[in-house]
Amino acid sequence: MSPAIKAPLLPNQEPSSSSSENHGSFAGAVFNISTSIVGAGIMAIPAAFKVLGVIPSLSIIVIIAWLSNVSAGFLMKSSLAGESTTYAGVMKESFGKSGAVAVTVVTMVVTFGSMIIFSIIIGDVISGNEKDGIIHLGLLQEWFGSHWWNTRFFGLLFIFVFLFLPLVLCRRVERLAFSSAISFLLALLFVVISSVLAIIALVQGKTKPPRLFPELNDGGLSFFSLFTASPVIVTAFTFHFNVHPVAFELKDPLNVLSATRISVILCATIYSATGLFCYLLFGDSTMTDVLMNFDQSTSSSVGSLLNDIVRLSYAIHLMLVFPLLNFSLRANLDELLFPMKLSLVEDNKRFFALTFPLLISCFLGAIAIPDIWYFFQFLGSTSTVSIAFIFPAAIVLRNVNGFSTLREKIVASVMLVLAVATSIIAISTNIYTFTATEET
């Protein structure tokens, strides 16, 4: 999941008519939405395959992809039936100011959490990590050996100071289609190379048959633990806060529905291929951040080069998306704290007062949290499921503008029940597992 938001969710004014002459392209809309979907979530998909098995994982990807497309349609239909051009505006029409604040806060949690996840993965790539007593070397250790300056702390510090800081100091984010295209193509490069490596390993007989279904050997806890993998896939399909900014840059906002459908199908295919081939390639040794698996040595220099390209290309992809998330987070936080102030671009003091604490907090979070799986479980079972399913379903059932059909209300009811039930089970299981681990 890379949720690149291009505009504050609570704008102070409607888009000016002068901007109507410069409409966004359909291809740009597809790239922007696809980049919003394919973020760090793809890194945890193979681990979900390991937990759930191949067939349940593929089934859940298809179901969540379909539900995500449907819920995005709910949002646009509600928006066009009313007068709102933002997600928060639609929530405000349905549930008042509290609804707008709720979706803004949840979006901030998702974007900040995603920034931490991105930073953790980048740290894994450049400086390595230790998992279950096994040390996974980063690119810097492989190239230059282990030194104090390429440890995780100093590696991330260098990235934050000399790369992220200059980028997040940019005050305007415009015309994201080109950067989104580059980011998406880098993600696609990762999928292609990992698929080729898996096929080569399969031909050479170096792979084991993947589990088609989960193994339930530990009783009820293992069964309920399956629900902790589903939120990871939900997080990977959360893009709904970017639908409105993309839609209202198009000549016809309804075209975003076709762009969304294409993006969801494309990303579901990419997720399925990534999960299947990476799980086939690494089997039960698949890590929660699959990039860490690509640090293993190979018998050829070509294999080692491909491993490095896989990790480096995706790390660069995340680096390109990171400033977009920061821009959205900062804009929404400013709108929440200072709704009556002048534009953030025109207020240096407020701009720096928000930028530096957010960046420092993200850096500290990436150092303190060693594993992206915990963050994916938390975000997927709380914030992202609210943005992707609970809020859109509630808008349809509320039906303030009278646009909902009986069929849509039935689908929304099922969506709401599934989302809430899965979240409760996932949260309860995570708490139980964490408590049991602490006791042992």
UniProtKB/Swiss-Prot annotation:
- The disulfide bridges present are none
Topology relative to the lipid bilayer, per the entry, is:
Multi-pass membrane protein
Instruction: Indicate where this protein is primarily found.
Output: membrane
Q: Where in the cell is it found?
A: Membrane
Q: Where are the transmembrane segments?
A: 26-46, 47-67, 102-122, 149-169, 182-202, 219-239, 262-282, 309-329, 356-376, 377-397, 410-430
What's a BP term from Gene Ontology annotated to this protein?
Answer: amino acid transport
Q: According to its UniProt record, which protein family does this protein belong to?
A: Belongs to the amino acid/polyamine transporter 2 family. Amino acid/auxin permease (AAAP) (TC 2.A.18.6) subfamily.
Q: What is this protein called?
A: Amino acid transporter AVT6D
Q: Which organism is it from?
A: Arabidopsis thaliana
Q: Which gene encodes it?
A: AVT6D
